[in-house]
C-alpha cells in the first residue's frame, strides 16, 4: 500500500505541475495525459485489491477508473500522433486538448477559436439555440492529420473531410427537437440566413466556405467583420430587411448548443476570475480577485478563501495544501452548487483560517495556479 501511495503522490505532483506551468507545448500535454492514465491505473489496481482509500484519497470504483484511463489513453495516442506532424509547432493550451473539448462536436477532433452563432427556431427569438463554428478543426483522415475550417449554411455547420462535407450540426434535426414548424433562422453577427421558402429572391455567395471563415477571423471588429461560413444556394436574405445586430462573442472555450429555456452545456475551459463586487475588489496571486464584505459583528466568523475550478485540479491542489497545514485551520472537500449548471469549472473547495493574518500569510506563501480563481470571504464558525 505504501508503494501505491508513493506512486499516486508522484502522479498527482506531475498533474498539478502541468496545471501550474500553463504550457503551450504539445509535448507537455502528452506528459499530462500520461500522468492521468497512470493515476487511474493505480486507482484501478487498488480497487481490485479491495482498497477504498490510498492515504487520504478515496479510490473510485472500477468502472470510473477504467473509463478515465481509457479517455487518457485515447488522448495520449491522439496527441502523440499529432505531435509527429507540422502542427506540433503551433501553440496548444491544456484547454485545447482537454476531455470536454475532445468530445465536443465535431467529436474526436481537436478544435480552436470557436465563434458563436444563434439559430432561431420557428422564427422566434425566444426559442433560440447557440452553436459553435470553429475556425480550425484538426481531424485524422486517411492521409493523417488535416487542418480545415468549418463553415455554416442553412442546413447546418460542417467542415470538409477528405473532400466531402461533414456536418457536425444539422439544423433540421435540431428543429425537430426544439421547434414545431420545422423552420429556423441562422444569425451570425450582422448577417442572417432565412428559410428559402419564405422569400422570393435568392442570394448566392461566390466565396468558398474556407475563404469566408478565414476572412471573418481576420476582421474581428464588429463593424467590419465578414460572416463565418457561406450562403448556400438554398439560403436567402429577406428583402427589405435590415441585418440583425446580434453580435456573438468570440471565444476559445467550447460550448455545445443551448437554448434560453434550457440549461447550457459546460465549457472546457475555466475562467481565471470571478465577477464579484467591484467596489471592494483586491488583486491576488494567479490573476484571481476577491471581495471583502461586511460581516455582522453579532456572529462569530472565520475568514475563508473559496477556490473555484475544475474538480480534479482542486483535488490535487487540496492534496498539496497538506504541506502547509500550519497556514490554515481546515479545508473542505470538493463541492458544487446544486442550483446552477454543474460545469467542468464550477467546483469549489473552501479553506478556513483562524484570523486575517493567517489567511494573508497563506496567500503570500502558497503558490496558487492561474487556472483557478479565488474569492475571499467570511463564514460562521463551525466545529473544526
Curated annotation (Swiss-Prot):
Q: Which residues form a coiled coil?
A: none
Q: What is its main location?
A: host cell
Any one GO molecular function term: DNA-binding transcription factor activity
Q: Where is this region: DNA-binding domain?
A: 301-384
Q: Where in the cell is it found?
A: Host nucleus
An example GO biological process term is: regulation of DNA replication
Mark the transmembrane ranges. none
The annotated region (Transactivation domain) lies at: 1-200
The post-translation modification note in this UniProt entry reads: Phosphorylated. Sumoylation plays a regulatory role in E2 transcriptional activity.
Q: Which InterPro entries match?
A: E2/EBNA1_C_sf, Nucleotide-bd_a/b_plait_sf, Papillomavirus_E2_C, PPV_E2_N, Reg_prot_E2, Regulatory_protein_E2_N, Regulatory_protein_E2_N_1, Regulatory_protein_E2_N_2
Q: Which UniProt keywords apply?
A: Activator, DNA replication, DNA-binding, Early protein, Host nucleus, Isopeptide bond, Phosphoprotein, Repressor, Transcription, Transcription regulation, Ubl conjugation
**Where in the chain is the Glycyl lysine isopeptide (Lys-Gly) (interchain with G-Cter in SUMO) cross-link?**
308
Q: Where is the composition biased (Polar residues)?
A: 220-237
Keyword Ubl conjugation attached: yes
Q: Name one Pfam family in it.
A: PPV_E2_N
Chain spans, region Disordered:
218-292
Q: Where is the composition biased (Low complexity)?
A: 251-263
Q: Which GO terms describe its cellular component?
A: host cell nucleus
Subunit and partners? Binds DNA as homodimer. Interacts with protein E1; this interaction greatly increases E1 DNA-binding activity. Interacts with protein L1; this interaction enhances E2-dependent replication and transcription activation. Interacts with protein L2; this interaction inhibits E2 transcriptional activity but not DNA replication function E2. Interacts with protein E7; this interaction inhibits E7 oncogenic activity. Interacts with host TAF1; this interaction modulates E2-dependent transcriptional regulation. Interacts with host BRD4; this interaction mediates E2 transcriptional activation function.
State the function annotated in the UniProt record. Answer: Plays a role in the initiation of viral DNA replication. A dimer of E2 interacts with a dimer of E1 in order to improve specificity of E1 DNA binding activity. Once the complex recognizes and binds DNA at specific sites, the E2 dimer is removed from DNA. E2 also regulates viral transcription through binding to the E2RE response element (5'-ACCNNNNNNGGT-3') present in multiple copies in the regulatory regions of the viral genome. Activates or represses transcription depending on E2RE's position with regards to proximal promoter elements including the TATA-box.
Q: Which family does it belong to?
A: Belongs to the papillomaviridae E2 protein family.
Report what the protein is called.
Answer: Regulatory protein E2
Which organism encodes this protein?
A: Human papillomavirus type 53
Species lineage: Viruses, Monodnaviria, Shotokuvirae, Cossaviricota, Papovaviricetes
Amino acid at each position: 500500500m505504501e508503494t501505491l501511495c508513493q506512486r499516486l503522490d508522484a502522479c498527482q505532483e506531475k498533474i498539478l505541475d502541468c496545471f501550474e506551468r500553463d504550457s503551450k507545448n504539445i509535448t507537455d500535454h502528452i506528459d499530462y495525459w500520461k500522468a492521468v492514465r497512470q493515476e487511474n491505473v493505480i486507482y484501478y489496481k487498488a480497487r481490485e485489491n479491495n482498497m477504498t482509500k490510498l492515504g487520504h484519497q478515496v479510490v473510485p470504483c472500477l468502472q470510473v477508473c477504467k473509463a478515465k484511463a481509457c479517455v487518457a489513453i485515447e488522448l495520449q495516442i491522439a496527441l502523440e500522433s499529432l505531435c509527429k506532424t507540422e502542427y506540433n509547432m503551433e501553440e496548444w493550451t491544456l484547454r485545447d486538448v482537454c476531455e470536454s473539448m475532445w468530445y465536443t462536436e465535431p467529436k474526436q477532433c481537436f478544435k480552436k477559436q470557436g465563434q458563436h452563432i444563434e439559430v432561431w427556431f420557428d422564427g422566434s427569438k425566444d426559442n433560440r439555440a447557440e452553436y459553435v463554428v470553429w475556425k480550425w478543426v484538426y481531424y485524422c483522415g486517411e492521409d493523417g492529420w488535416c487542418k480545415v475550417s468549418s463553415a455554416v449554411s442553412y442546413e447546418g455547420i460542417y467542415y470538409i473531410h477528405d473532400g466531402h462535407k461533414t456536418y457536425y450540426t444539422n439544423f433540421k434535426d435540431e428543429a425537430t427537437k426544439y421547434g414545431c414548424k420545422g423552420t429556423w433562422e441562422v444569425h451570425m453577427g450582422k448577417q442572417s440566413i432565412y428559410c428559402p421558402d419564405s422569400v422570393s429572391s435568392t442570394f448566392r455567395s461566390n466565396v468558398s466556405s474556407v475563404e469566408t471563415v478565414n476572412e471573418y477571423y481576420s476582421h474581428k471588429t464588429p463593424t467590419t467583420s465578414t460572416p463565418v461560413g457561406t450562403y448556400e444556394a438554398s439560403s436567402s436574405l429577406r428583402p427589405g430587411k435590415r441585418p440583425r445586430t446580434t453580435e456573438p462573442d468570440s471565444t476559445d472555450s467550447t460550448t455545445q448548443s443551448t437554448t434560453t429555456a434550457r440549461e447550457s452545456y459546460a465549457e472546457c475551459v475555466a475562467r481565471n476570475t470571478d465577477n464579484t463586487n467591484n467596489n471592494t475588489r483586491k488583486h491576488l496571486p494567479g490573476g484571481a480577485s476577491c471581495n471583502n464584505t461586511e460581516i455582522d459583528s453579532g456572529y462569530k466568523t472565520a475568514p475563508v478563501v473559496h477556490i473555484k475550478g475544475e474538480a480534479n485540479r482542486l483535488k490535487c491542489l487540496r492534496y498539496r495544501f497538506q504541506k502547509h497545514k500550519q497556514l490554515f485551520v481546515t479545508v473542505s472537500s470538493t463541492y458544487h452548487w446544486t442550483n446552477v449548471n454543474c460545469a467542468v469549472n464550477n467546483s469549489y473547495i473552501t479553506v478556513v483560517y483562524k484570523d486575517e493574518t493567517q489567511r494573508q500569510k497563506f496567500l503570500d506563501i502558497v503558490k496558487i495556479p492561474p487556472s483557478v480563481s479565488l474569492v475571499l470571504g467570511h463564514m460562521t464558525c463551525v466545529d473544526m
